[in-house]
């Protein structure tokens, strides 16, 4: 499987090199990104696409496309095809999450960034350390698909999302100066909404009588952090599989019985078996929290805000916050 993926990536990189060497005035296929004078922006992942759409809302002549399919979630297993990289090379700007989340695109992005086309949405954000082991604390080992020692899922916290939309607007303004003011104005409106959500999250930790939480995956760490909650354990970090050994499950269950966290947070569409078993063994309830890492291809403009508002209501209910 790894050999096949490597071959696919090498072939795609070769195609991309050919595309980059083509004359800048070479014709593009009808309907391809950048056709008919459009300023096409390619967003790598679903949350980055949501944020980029908000920045580009009602800006004439600008089209935002999504690179990784909307339902993919965390993209570390995604292998782009030659056709995918054709789309990428045709875009006028490429917006990435950054922090190594798009490791599968490292070589193509380096080639494209020679034209300053790549916009890193993580610039100016404050990433959390990557967790290591069941204690949920960062010890600097990082993700296979992220920057060393860093949790790359910054999109999952509204305060960081606000910084991301501002970084996107700044980068797009450099690529398309004629619309820089419109990008900046849209970003400030979106950032204000996200900062409002972050303030609501912070209120939970200020008033909750108990604050312990267990996370199914480390992307939920940003929600827990902004809510002022105390992460007792992280069941899965980075590319780790979701299966817990019986001995690890029993040890975690004993620990949770002793520490009595309020909630085990799983992820939609349903918690994995480890979450259900741990909840059953420890007596700690579980609920689903959505980081908006994936979603519908026709997501509404306020999709991110609605998802985060639902998360806030769930946390308020379990942490006894009115």
Predicted regions span which residues?
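General helical structural elements
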Residues: 8-9, 32
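Bacterial N-terminal signal peptides
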Residues: 10-23
């Amino acid at each position: 499987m790894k050999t096949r993926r490597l071959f696919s990536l090498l072939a795609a990189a070769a195609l991309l090199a050919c595309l980059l060497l083509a004359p800048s005035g070479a014709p593009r296929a009808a309907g391809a990104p950048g056709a008919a004078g459009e300023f096409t922006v390619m967003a790598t992942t679903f949350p980055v696409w949501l944020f980029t759409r908000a920045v580009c809302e009602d800006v004439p002549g600008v089209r935002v496309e999504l690179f990784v399919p909307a339902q993919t979630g965390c993209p570390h297993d995604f292998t782009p095809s030659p056709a995918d990289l054709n789309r990428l090379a045709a875009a006028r700007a490429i917006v990435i999450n950054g922090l190594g989340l798009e490791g599968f695109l490292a070589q193509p992005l380096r080639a494209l960034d020679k034209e300053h086309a790549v916009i890193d949405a993580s610039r100016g954000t404050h990433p959390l350390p990557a967790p290591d082991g069941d204690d949920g604390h960062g010890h600097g080992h990082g993700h296979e698909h992220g920057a060393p020692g860093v949790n790359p899922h910054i999109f999952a916290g509204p305060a960081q999302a606000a910084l991301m939309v501002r970084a996107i607007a700044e980068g797009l303004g450099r690529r398309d100066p004629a619309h820089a003011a419109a990008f900046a104005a849209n970003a400030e409106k979106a950032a204000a909404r996200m900062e409002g959500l972050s303030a609501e999250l912070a209120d939970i930790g200020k008033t909750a009588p108990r604050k312990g939480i267990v996370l199914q995956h480390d992307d939920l760490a940003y929600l827990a952090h902004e809510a002022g909650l105390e992460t007792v354990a992280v069941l899965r970090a980075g590319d780790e599989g979701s299966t817990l050994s019986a001995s690890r499950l029993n040890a975690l269950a004993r620990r949770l019985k002793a520490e009595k966290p309020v909630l085990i947070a799983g992820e939609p569409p349903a918690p994995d078996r480890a979450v259900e078993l741990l909840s059953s063994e420890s007596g700690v309830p579980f609920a689903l929290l959505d980081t908006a890492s994936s979603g519908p291809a026709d997501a509404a403009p306020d999709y991110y805000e609605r998802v985060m508002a639902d998360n806030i209501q769930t946390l308020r209910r379990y942490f006894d916050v009115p």
